[in-house]
A protein has these predicted regions:
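Basic/polar N-terminal segments that are highly enriched at the extreme N-terminus
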Residues: 1-5, 28-32, 1012
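Bacterial N-terminal signal peptides that target proteins for export
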Residues: 2-14
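Intrinsic low-complexity/disordered segments
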Residues: 3-4, 25-27, 759, 766
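Bacterial N-terminal signal peptides
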Residues: 13-24
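Predominantly soluble domains enriched in secretory-pathway, periplasmic, or organellar proteins
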Residues: 24, 29-498
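N-terminal pro-sequences and low-complexity stem/linker regions of secreted or lumenal proteins
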Residues: 462, 478-1012
């Protein structure tokens, strides 16, 4: 047997190792003698899918002729045939693979078909489906199965032929289509090179599927139409579908504007055609809608549940419905005869496995459940804990509990059993990504040199896993449970040293400023830094573009082993603001981000307060339409203020699981500058919010909040995400409030109708008694500086209209804010935390998640290189500890604060913001300090016309609507010239001999005529 490699390397060297070990585990899937772990460095966890005795763990290879080694991602649903001999595995995610050129790609989802008649799975076939979203079901005959078509708004029928091959049937008449012109929502569509137009309606999305016992009734959940469609007649004789809108106001005028039935996701059907009943999980409204299918479908009951209902399963007698719920991490057992909830089963861990201090927290992301054939156990997948919870069912519907945990791959989504119940089949959606320096895609102008796409975009690197093992015995479960506890660090306690450091920092710090930025990797920004493990060959926005970020790293701490937890902005904002991404986001983002590589599969960016682009922070239709006149005139469109993607707070207080909620619960103060702001009306052809540099001077509101808690705490004059608007003016608005509201009169800067030039240090003596938690500056300030995202070059104002200028603008805004605090009375009791929400927009030689992070203030070490492996969750936990806040969920409760970056006593510090020389270009009209004598102003790599032409057709209306892969390649070509894009991962530790490395790098810049 091949001995597998241990994973106890420092993260700086782990990028290459992670890729090798993942491949090694798959290649030697039957070797279970040494079930070594795989690290998840961006999560602080490890996985051990080979831990169950007799386990196999293998990739999902669809055997594409054009790319035989490519592996599918996001396995989401398993279903066994009625005779238990065949297993289907549905992959529903990004799954776009380039096969040699820009125009040659496969854009399919996949159904893997396995023979499990002899327990060990044998792959027989892979069927390609254009689009899908979780839903798949066998016909009771076992000779057909149905797959919901996602944004295609249809159902695919796949039939077993006489030759033993499965094939999709061509649509019959009438076809199994739902006939939706659009979903319920607001769609923001790009309008060519100019402004955008907001349009009513989003793409539909066919999700869960269920069929009656006799095969005569088929029900599909219409996720974005808040409805179900019912087909009658059976295979070969299906009638045209009948739709039932599940929203109360659509069937009862007295209930117009009452929430209910929205985000219909999963379906279970009880009974046969003549008397069938459907149960539908409404994710947003936290209810199970009970629908009678006799005659005209009608809602007969709504069963309220505490969590977000996900997948469901019926027992064989169809007397009990098991509903898995995220947010609560529970399973509700519902009696189908009475619609009563008989019991609620916690499914995080067996009693006593979690330390008492952790028992109050949730965050397991429970997402599916399957009954064993003997119905003595219920297997529940806990996505965020990478395990299956085994629930012992006593038959009394009371006192059932978890008796063990089984390790799985990363983010399990579904599990099935063999017919006799002796074997288990589990699938997961993710895998470690490793390095991605070859993130390569030829985008932009057609004259650019072509490039073979490397399929290294972050979500493309997330590969599905298929785990199979004999059903564990009770004794084996004990061992496996202990392994899950180790994998998730359930026994973690903060060391005495860390606790002492954090206590000292907490005692001296009263204010935290949290700056959130966009999408950059470590190598893109700090690859050319004098210290640390950076690769200058991957540096696109180096010292010449980002002098302030470089100075922050050198003056304070260089975090060269910091990994963001998220893959993209859709999950990046939840991870950055709440230390978790709910299952609804984990399920949606891989499908949504197919648009990032040129394939639209629908869904929306729900993680910043809008749901389907509708601002649900406002309680009434009139208020919504005042904030956004594009809002459809429909009181039943997502009524109420529930945000489907927001995490819960303690005690499952709905939607209050964010960092600012925790601060407010602790009696602290919060001010918001740009977080959770509606972007719909930026750059529109009508109803536009104007691009003005100083909206406060004219009293023009430019920020309409999308979070209920933040709404009264949001600066209405601080513009949200908009690439056309420089971060300098965002800083200026923050500084206006700071000067006017948080300084004593002698320290205030004068008011101005135009932003003043960057101020010098204010001659104010510290007045520490004024700058306390109870008065003065807020305890927690949220500041969004987003211009490092770059884009929208044709509309950008004040000449800040190229990528390097926009990143330089972002860098200067960060520097100005740090300078402002450094020269203020708050210098000694404030910490400034700077984070990227994700690292999707570039390559890195260590890990695709490695990014920049900065911390500044009196308690931060100075001139230190810190290579401790930290991640976003640790970052959030650190801010919590500084503010004296308890953890929000299991993730941050198990995180280690970043104590290595702090001293226990404050040090004097200062900071002077330095504009990049690029910003002194003649066409840039930002109010900068006087140009230093002798400063040579380099020309930007290209002018705005070049960048506008190269990015024509790209959608910059919101983060991540643009094709990141194409945009990254466009940036590389425009900034780096003809320098070849790196071909593959190195994983090298480049901390040593940096002086020699950088001399060679700078010499190459001169030879190539570039600056960086």
């Amino acid at each position: 047997m091949t001995k597998k490699v241990q994973h106890r390397l420092p993260r700086a060297a782990a990028g290459l190792t992670m890729v090798f070990c993942l491949s090694s585990t798959f290649a030697h899937a039957q070797d279970t003698a040494n079930p070594d772990s795989q690290d998840l460095p961006n999560m602080g966890q490890q996985i051990t899918p080979l831990a169950p005795p007799g386990a196999r763990f293998e990739p999902m290879n669809p055997d594409l002729t054009a790319n035989p080694s490519w592996l599918a991602g996001q396995a989401v649903t398993t279903v066994a045939s009625p005779d238990g001999k065949t297993l289907l595995v549905l992959c529903s995610g990004l799954n776009v693979v380039f096969t040699g050129s820009l125009t040659s790609r496969i854009t399919s989802q996949f159904v893997f078909i396995y023979d499990i008649s002899a327990h060990q799975p044998v792959k027989k076939q892979v069927v390609q489906i254009p689009n899908t979203y979780n839903g798949i079901v066998f016909d009771p005959s076992g000779t057909h199965f149905y797959v919901a078509g996602g944004s295609d708004d249809d159902i695919h029928t796949v039939t077993l032929g006489s030759n033993g091959t499965w094939a999709e049937e061509q649509p019959t008449s009438p076809a199994l289509t739902m006939g939706h012109a659009a979903g319920n929502g607001l769609s923001v569509q790009p309008g060519g090179t100019g402004p955008v137009n907001a349009q009513v309606g989003v793409k539909p999305c066919a999700a869960g599927l269920a069929i009656s016992k006799d095969g005569k009734t088929l029900v599909v959940a219409n996720y974005y139409n808040d409805s179900i469609t019912v087909f009658s007649g059976g295979y070969g004789n299906w009638s045209k579908g009948t739709e039932l809108d599940l929203r109360p106001g659509k069937s009862n005028p007295a209930q117009v504007g009452v929430p209910g039935g929205e985000y219909a996701f999963w379906v279970a059907v009880k009974g046969s055609a003549a008397s069938a009943t459907a149960y539908i999980s409404s994710v947003r409204d936290r209810e199970i809608d009970v629908v009678s299918l006799s005659g005209t479908p009608a809602v007969t009951a709504r069963i309220s549940v505490k969590g977000q209902p996900n997948k469901m399963t019926l027992n064989a007698a169809q007397s009990l419905l098991y509903v898995v719920e995220d947010e609560t991490d529970t399973v509700d057992v519902i009696a189908t005869a009475s619609n009563a909830i008989l019991e609620t089963i916690p499914v995080i861990a067996p009693p006593g496995v979690l330390p008492t201090a952790l028992a109050q927290y949730t965050g397991a992301n429970s997402d599916s459940a399957t009954l064993s054939p003997d119905e003595k156990q219920l297997y529940v997948t806990n996505g965020n804990l990478n395990c299956i919870a085994v629930v012992a069912l006593g038959g009394t519907n009371s006192g059932d509990q978890v008796v063990g945990l089984i390790p799985t791959g990363w983010y399990p989504n579904s599990v099935s059993f063999s017919a006799d119940g002796s074997w288990v089949y589990a699938v997961n959606g993710k895998s470690p990504t490793g390095a991605n320096p070859g993130f390569c895609y030829s985008g932009g102008a057609p004259t650019y040199p072509s490039c073979i796409p490397a399929n290294q975009y972050n979500p493309q690197l997330l590969k599905a896993g298929f785990q199979t093992f004999p059903r564990p015995t009770a004794a084996q479960l004990t061992t496996l449970t202990a392994q899950v506890a180790v994998n998730n660090r359930f026994s973690f306690t903060e060391s005495a040293g860390d606790a002492a450091v954090m206590a000292a920092v907490r005692a001296g710090v009263q204010h935290v400023i949290f700056i959130l930025k966009e999408n950059r990797t470590y190598d893109q920004i700090l690859g050319d830094l004098e210290v640390g493990n950076g690769d200058p060959d991957l540096t696109e926005f180096g010292q010449a573009v980002t002098p302030n970020l470089h100075n922050l790293a050198l003056n304070f701490v260089t975090l060269d082993n910091f990994l963001v937890t998220a893959e993209v902005s859709n999950d990046g904002w939840p991870w950055s603001t709440s230390a978790r991404a709910p299952d609804v986001i984990e399920r949606q983002f891989p499908v949504f981000y197919s648009s990032a590589v040129g394939v639209s599969r629908g869904l929306s960016l729900d993680s910043e307060g809008v749901n389907r682009s509708v601002n649900v922070a406002y309680p009434t239709l009139a208020e919504r339409q005042f904030a956004d006149p594009f809002t459809p005139d429909d009181p039943d469109l997502l009524p109420g203020q529930t945000n489907v993607a927001a995490p819960d707070g303690p005690g499952n207080e709905i939607n209050t699981g964010y960092l600012w909620d925790a601060a407010l619960r602790a009696g602290l103060t919060v001010r918001n500058y740009g977080f959770f702001v509606d972007q719909t009306r930026y750059n529109t052809t009508t109803n536009t919010i104007p691009l003005i540099e100083n909206p406060a001077a004219d009293g023009i509101v430019v920020a309409y909040p999308t979070n209920v808690t933040l709404a009264p705490r949001t600066d209405p004059y601080f513009r949200g995400f908009d690439n056309a608007f420089p971060d300098y003016y965002r800083y200026a608005e923050w500084a206006r409030e700071f000067d006017n509201n948080y300084l004593v009169p002698a320290c205030r800067a004068p008011e101005s109708r135009k932003p003043a030039p960057a101020p010098t240090a204010l001659p104010c003596a510290p007045h520490s008694q004024t700058a306390r938690r109870s008065t003065g500056m807020p305890s927690l300030s949220l500041v969004r500086f987003m211009h490092d995202h770059t884009g929208n070059f044709s509309a950008a104002i004040d000449g800040v209209n190229t990528p390097d200028l926009q990143v330089a603008d972002n860098d200067y805004a960060v520097g100005l804010l740090v300078q402002k605090i450094a020269s203020s009375p708050y210098a000694n009791n404030t910490l400034i935390f700077v984070l990227e929400d994700d690292a999707q927009d570039g390559g890195d030689h260590v890990d695709s998640h490695r990014s920049v992070a900065f911390v500044a203030g009196a308690f931060v070490k100075q001139g230190a290189l810190i290579s401790t492996p930290y991640n976003t969750i640790d970052f959030v936990r650190t801010m919590e500890e500084v503010l004296g806040l308890p953890p929000m969920n299991l993730n941050d409760a198990l995180a280690r604060p970043m104590a290595d970056i702090f001293n226990t006593t404050p040090s004097a510090w200062s900071f002077t913001a330095t504009p990049s020389a690029l910003l002194y270009a003649p066409r840039v009209s930002l109010p900068l300090p006087p140009q230093p004598t002798g400063l040579v102003v380099p020309k930007p790599s290209h002018d705005a016309t070049y960048w506008a032409r190269a990015s024509e057709g790209m959608d910059f209306t919101s983060e991540d609507r643009v094709d990141p892969a194409g945009f990254n390649r466009l940036l590389w070509k425009g900034l780096m010239g003809d320098k070849p894009y790196p071909a593959g991962p190195s994983g090298m530790d480049l901390r040593h001999n940096r002086a020699t490395l950088l001399v060679r790098y700078r010499q190459s810049l001169k030879e190539e005529g570039r600056r960086n």
